[in-house]
Each structure stands twice: as structure tokens, then as C-alpha cells.
């Protein structure tokens, strides 16, 4: 049953990632760096932080048997965000020797995702 809950959340998260990515690519057809995946990962980090803040009111209090965590934390946000695509896009920038774009993309992705998670968590944990 737990696998089904994760799969449903993951399916919805993957579809949401695709839709946000497509929307971003239409709005920014020639971005300075991979902005669609950056936005997806920042939104996902904020969303996961808000999910923990609203649902658990403390960091990482979830259990692997908790249906909400299985669906939202592992399923939806696990599929919505993507470290593997971030890595591919970073390697493409390395291959193209786009050092400034690479540095900006990596810094914004890593620091931005952590900041977005904390903003989501602390912005909602007292509700």
C-alpha cells in the first residue's frame, strides 16, 4: 500500500514538474542558464519546507509509515524536484565552457533551494 501512495504522489509530482517546466520554457525561450529547472527546484524546495512546516511543525518529524509523508514528501516533492536533471544541465554548461553561467546556476540552485526550504518551513511552521 505504501508503494502505491508514493507512486500516486510521484506521478502527480512528475506531471506538475513537466507542466511548470513547459510553462517556463515558453516564457523564457532563450534563458541565460537552465531557468526552468532552477524554478522547479526552488518551488519544490519551498513547497517541501512548507509541507513540513504545516504538516509536522518541526523538521523531519515524519515517519516512513506516515501517509502524508509518503504521498507528499517522498512522492510528490521527490518527483517534482530533480537533482539528476540539475546535474545534466550543469555538465552541459561545463562542456560548453560557460563558467559564469555554471557558477550562477549551481550557486542559485544549491543555496537557493536551501533558502527556499527554510523560508517555506519557517514561514508556515507557526501556523
UniProtKB/Swiss-Prot annotation:
TM segment ranges: 3-23, 35-55, 74-94, 102-122
Disulfide partners: none
InterPro entries membership: FluC (IPR003691)
Topology in the lipid bilayer: Multi-pass membrane protein
Catalyzed reactions: fluoride(in) = fluoride(out)
Keyword Transcription regulation belongs to the record: no
Annotated residues for binding of Na(+): 78, 81
Localization annotation: Cell membrane
Keywords: Cell membrane, Ion channel, Ion transport, Membrane, Metal-binding, Sodium, Transmembrane, Transmembrane helix, Transport
Notes on activation and inhibition: Na(+) is not transported, but it plays an essential structural role and its presence is essential for fluoride channel function.
GO molecular function, one term: fluoride channel activity
GO biological process, one term: cellular detoxification of fluoride
Listed GO CC annotations: plasma membrane
Its biological purpose: Fluoride-specific ion channel. Important for reducing fluoride concentration in the cell, thus reducing its toxicity.
Family assignment from sequence similarity: Belongs to the fluoride channel Fluc/FEX (TC 1.A.43) family.
Protein name: Fluoride-specific ion channel FluC 1
